[in-house]
Amino acid sequence: MANKATKKGSKVYVCALAQNTDLIQSAYVALTWVQVGKVGNVGDFGADSTMNSYNTLDEPVTQKQKGTANAGDPQIEVASVFDDAGQIILRTFGDPLNLDNMAIKIERNDGGAGKTNTIFYSRGVVSGPLYPGGGSDDFELERFTIGLNQLPIRVNPTIIP
């Protein structure tokens, strides 16, 4: 069993071409990816279903069922670099008049020697950048929110032939 991994060394990639319909893994793999530079933080993503409940007179316990799933709204925080190609793509999709979905690829640094890393693929609309305030010791940052419109596709590590 592999040792546990931290987020250090993980990478975020984006695609400049809009992806407005659900994709399968092979379609994501075929896209042209641009790495986003100076990523400092990636927010939560993944299936988060609503929990619907209904009380009936004949049941002593509230009855529950899953409802609609939210794929997530992760924030991508970057140290602002005006000419970073990945950040430029994020800014382009973040324009309030841009209603297209952007494809995103998140690669963990967890495969180890002789293996690929875990990869997540998804797509969604982008909001931002938000420019956080701060003081004299704070970096100039930008935050983008990705409203995912497809459940992430997880690709586990495999042995490199």
Model-derived features: where do they sit?
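Extracellular/virion structural assembly segments
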Residues: E59-S122, R154-P161
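Solvent-exposed edge beta-strands and adjacent loop segments
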Residues: A2-E77, V125-D138
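A structural detector for beta-sheet-dominated domains
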Residues: C15, G37-G40, A79, E107, ...
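Hydrophobic beta-strand residues in large extracellular and virion-surface proteins
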Residues: V12-V14, I104, I146
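Short beta-strand and beta-hairpin "edge-sheet" elements
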Residues: E107-R154
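Surface-exposed beta-strand edges and their flanking turn/coil or helix-capping segments
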Residues: M51-Y54, I89-R91, G134-L141, P157-P161
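Viral virion structural and adsorption modules
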Residues: M1-K7, G147, L151-P161
